[in-house]
């Protein structure tokens, strides 16, 4: 049982030190994907608008 507690303690210390960084990284990945998708869509729309105005 003491080995388990020791492991748990080490895991908790690691989480306290690096948990925020890990969570932030995951959030950035998730948000980044969404933002990236939106940015791509915006770029496509802008591209279409620019091409449309050039034709006229």
UniProtKB/Swiss-Prot annotation:
This protein's major location comes to: host cell
**Cellular component aspect of the GO annotation:** host cell plasma membrane; membrane
Q: Does the keyword Membrane apply?
A: yes
Question: Where does this polypeptide localize?
Answer: Host cell outer membrane; Host cell inner membrane
Q: Which UniProt keywords apply?
A: Antimicrobial, Cytolysis, Host cell inner membrane, Host cell lysis by virus, Host cell membrane, Host cell outer membrane, Host membrane, Membrane, Viral release from host cell
GO terms classed as biological process: killing of cells of another organism
Protein task: Disrupts the host outer membranes during host lysis.
UniProt-recorded name of the protein: Disruptin gp28
Species of origin: Escherichia phage phiKT
């Amino acid at each position: 049982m003491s080995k388990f507690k020791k492991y748990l303690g080490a895991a908790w210390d690691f989480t306290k030190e690096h948990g925020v960084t890990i969570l932030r990284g995951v959030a950035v990945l998730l948000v980044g994907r969404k933002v990236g998708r939106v940015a791509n869509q915006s770029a496509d729309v802008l591209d279409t608008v620019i091409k449309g105005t050039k034709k006229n």
